[in-house]
Amino acid sequence: MTNIRKTHPLMKIVNNAFIDLPTPSNISSWWNFGSLLGICLILQILTGLFLAMHYTSDTTTAFSSVTHICRDVNYGWIIRYMHANGASMFFICLFMHVGRGLYYGSYTFLETWNIGVILLLTTMXTAFMGYVLPWGQMSFWGATVXTNLLSAIPYIGTDLVEWIWGGFSVDKATLTRFFAFHFILPFIIAALAMVHLLFLHETGSNNPTGILSDADKIPFHPYYTIKDILGAMLLILTLMLLVLFSPDLLGDPDNYTPANPLNTPPHIKPEWYFLFAYAILRSIPNKLGGVLALALSILVLMFVPFLHMSKQRSMMFRPISQCVFWTLVADLLALTWIGGQPVEHPYMVIGQLASIMYFLIILVMMPVASTIENNLLKW
């Protein structure tokens, strides 16, 4: 009799995705981040669900309800900090996952890559709206500044901003709709992740060499299930160390002050995972230009597959491209640092240079490095 997991309509899908899936035998730990992102998403949905049971999306009570969760709800403090720091872990995994894709040429799977970029954008929007919910100073001013950017869109800008706000300023209507969107978007992300996986399984996984691995495949279970469990344990260990020892390490002290429209904080800045994009936004003196640069900082990833000039897929055997890639990583770290600094003399110039370098590396230096390598190998 054939095994039920191979015949049952529902089990068959699970079997083909997680058990009998033919997988390259040489994929490294850089391939663990996909499953880690899945775990992060499940964790965020579960902790978020329990937070939503006690949270109130009203401007007068939102801040107090978060305080109530931390003080009065059983284990509310750990749920709240797991959710807040879970977002940080989510973005660490996202950046590693995208970096892996860039390094090993996984972007040549066009559909998978483009859905991945859409997933990144959706996750960023979800995290932004979540940051508004505690209704602290940085929540309020972050929402005001970031939504106001849309007013730079010619002709319809102002109307668009007021439509998003549900009034003439960030107020009760804004908070309520942000809560509604923040609740629904993770489920949309989960659905998109399924499509992401569907397209990936059409082609099979890439591997560190970038060479077709059809001749050397192994079943996903038990080899990669056990590897994913190890990754998950390390992820949860890191998250719990953060939650239990320094839960506010990555947060902003200003968010422990209730939102006050009459008092602007001295330095408005987003959470650490948006600082690189924020630095790019601020580096352009023109409002519309800044907004376009901000959008392009993520959308530029969609151009990467078309700029692939190398005859090899992966960067594993391409030392010049490797140097360019790690320069990009260093540049992103510099942008992250600049995004958290005030708009003053040395920081402004560094931010502008780092922003120019970011686009230059992706759009010019990477294709040039690939072409040089092709010529060196007489290809």
From Swiss-Prot:
Membrane topology: Multi-pass membrane protein
Record-level Gene Ontology MF annotations: metal ion binding; ubiquinol-cytochrome-c reductase activity
Membrane-spanning intervals of the chain: 33-53, 77-98, 113-133, 178-198, 226-246, 288-308, 320-340, 347-367
Pfam families linked: Cytochrom_B_C (PF00032), Cytochrome_B (PF00033)
PROSITE patterns: CYTB_CTER (PS51003), CYTB_NTER (PS51002)
Gene Ontology CC: one annotated term: mitochondrial inner membrane
Record keywords, A-Z: Electron transport, Heme, Iron, Membrane, Metal-binding, Mitochondrion, Mitochondrion inner membrane, Respiratory chain, Transmembrane, Transmembrane helix, Transport, Ubiquinone
Binding-site residues, heme b b566: 97, 196
Secretion signal, residue range per the UniProt entry: none
SUPFAM superfamilies associated with the record: a domain/subunit of cytochrome bc1 complex (Ubiquinol-cytochrome c reductase), Transmembrane di-heme cytochromes
Residues reported in the UniProt entry to bind a ubiquinone: 201
GO terms (BP aspect): mitochondrial electron transport, ubiquinol to cytochrome c
Subcellular location: Mitochondrion inner membrane
Cofactor: heme b
Residues reported in the UniProt entry to bind heme b b562: 83, 182
Cofactor binding summary note: Binds 2 heme b groups non-covalently.
Assembly description: The cytochrome bc1 complex contains 11 subunits: 3 respiratory subunits (MT-CYB, CYC1 and UQCRFS1), 2 core proteins (UQCRC1 and UQCRC2) and 6 low-molecular weight proteins (UQCRH/QCR6, UQCRB/QCR7, UQCRQ/QCR8, UQCR10/QCR9, UQCR11/QCR10 and a cleavage product of UQCRFS1). This cytochrome bc1 complex then forms a dimer.
Other facts noted in the record for this chain: Heme 1 (or BL or b562) is low-potential and absorbs at about 562 nm, and heme 2 (or BH or b566) is high-potential and absorbs at about 566 nm.
Role played: Component of the ubiquinol-cytochrome c reductase complex (complex III or cytochrome b-c1 complex) that is part of the mitochondrial respiratory chain. The b-c1 complex mediates electron transfer from ubiquinol to cytochrome c. Contributes to the generation of a proton gradient across the mitochondrial membrane that is then used for ATP synthesis.
Family membership: Belongs to the cytochrome b family.
Protein name: Cytochrome b
Native source species: Oreamnos americanus
